Amino acid sequence: MHLISYKHFVPNSLNLENLFDSLQNVAWTSHGPIELDDIDKRILLSRKNNESLEIKSVDKFPCLTDYIIPPSVRIGDASRVRLGAYLSEGTTVMHEGFVNFNAGTLGPAMIEGRISAGVVVGRNSDLGGGCSTMGTLSGGNEVKVSIGENCLLGANSGLGIPLGDNCTIEAGLYITAGSKITTYNSNNEPESVVKASELSGCNNLLFIRNSQSGAIEAKINPKSVALNKTLHKN
């Protein structure tokens, strides 16, 4: 995890198979990691000695910032970024953002949503508040989700396919691999209905839900995301 967070290796480049089987749950505290069999005694001892012992979490992974402070990165709530997160310079993780291990950003990015394990986000992309990306830790999902450069995931949206560059998903729209999507040509005319998985990695797409029919539509994206540079001068 240190090698990834120090950015010696990008996410998904190391063999992490059976990692969870090899790690134990540990109490991560202000005095460092403590085995769960010892935590009750340590709590009593700290009270006896009038010492402060803060238990930050009980988990297999500590918070990133307990061990590594990435350069030129802003993190609103350090408890929401695990060790093993890969955060590039210029990344801002707001208070509701979350970054799992073996996941992260490949350039400046605004993170107000969830980056699940195995997910990477391209340069100058924006994950809106409450949005979600599907990881590979549970649920049988073997597709590694990625987000290209200059993309926007609207608030409370979701993504279950790899997204190309310059793509936008409207707020509240969750796209899974099996979602049926109507594609439109450059004349804004409907062409065909395809599974979202067939659009994996395609660039310059705008994903919206038709407010009258409820159908999911993919059109040519007329805009490109531009991050507020002031917010990313970390």
Predicted feature locations:
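Terminal amphipathic alpha-helical/low-complexity segments used for targeting or macromolecular assembly
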Residues: 1-66, 198-234
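Alpha-helix boundary/capping detector
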Residues: 27, 123, 177-179, 195, ...
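A mid-sequence, solvent-exposed acidic-amphipathic segment
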Residues: 65-68, 80
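A structural motif detector for beta-strand N-caps
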Residues: 73, 79-81, 85-87, 91-93, ...
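C-terminal amphipathic alpha-helical segment
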Residues: 130-202, 209, 214-217
